[in-house]
UniProtKB/Swiss-Prot annotation:
Similarity remark: Belongs to the glutamate 5-kinase family.
SMART domains noted in UniProt: PUA
Organism: Phenylobacterium zucineum (strain HLK1)
Catalyzed reactions per annotation: L-glutamate + ATP = L-glutamyl 5-phosphate + ADP
SUPFAM superfamilies assigned: Carbamate kinase-like, PUA domain-like
Residues annotated as binding ATP: 13, 172-173, 216-222
Database matches in Pfam families: AA_kinase, PUA
Binding site for substrate: 53, 140, 152
Subcellular location: Cytoplasm
Name of the molecule in the record: Glutamate 5-kinase
InterPro entries: AceGlu_kinase-like_sf (IPR036393), Asp/Glu/Uridylate_kinase (IPR001048), G5K_ProB (IPR041739), Glu/AcGlu_kinase (IPR001057), Glu_5kinase (IPR011529), Glu_5kinase/COase_Synthase (IPR005715), Glutamate_5-kinase_CS (IPR019797), PUA (IPR002478)
Length: 375
């Protein structure tokens, strides 16, 4: 089982070879089939995000660039020219299903610099809440080699982490991982499930690289992406993208490789908060707030007695009781000066004091309990 039918949130990576034909024009029929596939999932309450290559390939045609290796300025120019054509193709595909698309362009800093990560996550969450299909791509127009993801397989894995996706689908030119390259070795065996990524699995992927003429990713990059996704609690499905309605095909039992996650998305996120971020300050809370946090509730301003340290919105902070015991760590939604101004206030009074509200001081989703603090 791929888990695709049960997933709440699915990220699908679509490569250039599926989207763009040899003549440099969009594959309109494939896009229409894929949109119908995604619309079927959306109709049963699932959220679908698309990580889409293709801007540079489409831009080549519009700018008349020869099919050769491009310089970085040429690639950036092609991306700028092709991105609008790419979005138009996606919009035309989803329009018959009443679904709006939205363009989201990212660089590596957007998923690795914490404040930008929070902003990117908030934007994508808002789009999903509005019923929009986010179409995400690397911002090739401005990106440099130092801040590139390198390929859209890795970008898709980072997006899966960003949004807490349950399943990442990597549409490939082969139907999964094999013990050797099946195009060269007739004895190669398909591997339907990878419970854990090992050096042996990665060695198999290194021998099964795709040799397409448009995109940049091969099987090794897909396994590298699966490792990123697994650490974030997301399963990865690698399957043949050229099938009619490839998502339905996977659900129907067509051949694919499923890389199982190491944990759940929520647990991975909480572990990241608890173990990877240095606290910039602390919020000292009363007994009622301490008990609420222990029960998995958000930390409201009304229960905060004191603010310690200097921190910005999105920084990690400690949550301590009045005896100095650490209860939790979390990502705060207000900078320190504003947090001090709203200490002890009820939620409905915050906007009148600050002129805005960002909800609770620390949302329950962004709180990781200390080991001894379980309710």
């Amino acid at each position: 089982m791929s888990g695709l039918g049960q997933a709440r949130r699915v990220v699908v990576k679509v490569g250039s070879a599926l989207l763009v034909g040899p003549d440099g024009a969009p594959h309109a029929d494939w896009l229409a089939d894929f949109a119908a596939d995604a619309a079927r999932m959306r109709a049963r309450g699932q959220q679908v995000l698309v990580v889409s290559s293709g801007a540079v390939a489409l831009g080549r045609r519009r700018l008349g660039l020869a099919r050769r290796a491009l310089t970085l300025p040429e690639k950036q120019a092609a991306a700028a020219a092709g991105q609008s054509a790419l979005m138009r193709a996606w919009e035309e595909a989803f329009e018959p299903h009443g679904a709006a698309c939205a363009q989201v362009l990212l660089t590596r800093d957007d998923t690795e610099v914490r404040r930008r990560w929070l902003n990117a996550r908030a934007t994508v969450e808002t789009l999903l809440g509005l019923g929009v299909v986010p179409v995400i791509n690397e911002n090739d127009t401005v990106v440099t080699e130092e801040i590139r993801y390198g390929d859209n397989d890795r970008l898709a894995a980072r997006v899966a982490q960003l949004v807490g996706a349950d399943v990442l689908v990597l549409l490939s030119d082969v139907d999964g991982l094999y013990t050797a390259d099946p195009r060269k070795d007739p004895a190669a065996r398909h591997i339907p499930r990878v419970p854990r990524l090992t050096p042996e699995v990665e060695a198999m992927a290194g021998g099964a690289n795709a040799e397409g003429g448009v995109g940049t990713g091969g099987m090794a990059t897909k396994i590298a992406a699966a490792r990123i996704a697994a650490a974030g609690g997301c399963a990865t499905v690698i399957t043949l993208g050229s099938r009619t309605r490839p998502l339905a095909a996977v659900e129907g039992g067509e051949r694919a490789t499923v890389v199982e996650p190491a944990t759940t998305p929520a647990a991975a996120y909480k572990a990241w908060i608890a173990g990877s971020l240095a606290p910039a300050g602390a919020l000292v809370v009363d007994d009622g707030a301490a008990q609420a946090v222990r029960r998995g509730k958000s930390l409201l301003a009304a229960g905060v007695r004191r603010v310690e340290g200097r921190f910005d919105k999105g920084d990690a902070v400690l949550v301590r009781d009045e005896a100095g015991r650490e209860i939790a760590r979390g990502l705060v939604r207000y900078e320190a000066a504003d947090a001090e101004r709203i200490c002890g206030l009820k939620s409905e009074a915050i906007e009148g004091v600050l002129g805005y509200t960002s909800g609770p001081l620390v949302h329950a989703d962004d709180l990781a309990l200390a080991a001894h603090a379980e309710a």
